Amino acid sequence: GRGRPGRLVEVGARGVGMFGCVVPTRVARNCTAFTKKGTISIKAGYNKRDWNPIEEDCECYACRHFTKAYLRHLLNVDEILGLRMLSVHNSHMFLDLMRNIRLHLDNGTFSEYRREFIAGYTPTLKVLEQRARHAESQQESSSK
């Protein structure tokens, strides 16, 4: 989808350096966090006793001060701080991603960065299913 991390890397390759995007906050409102490896649902039961930050090497306020278990608790009791911290984290992740894209473009190492990022980034099951349906519909269209 538009505005997702993998897509940002692709448009960065085309020289796009600035754009508006509501995805980080929209996804946060659905209790989901972006990471360098894909998305995670903070409300999922497996986070109930996960005392780690959303992403270990993230320097955002949410990751430096809150665990997934505590964020999950905040979301489950409808405390607005939970959604705010997910928005902070997701926005930070996107800014960091764009910073890395610019850095690698400037250093001439973007192709390697893009390859490594895409190889390590796993989209959600929903995205994978949408891609499969899209590929099937394109195959059907081309065979007619």
Where are these regions (language model features)?
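Glycine-rich phosphate/ribose-binding loops and adjacent secondary-structure elements
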Residues: 1-54
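C-terminal extensions of enzymes
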Residues: 57-144
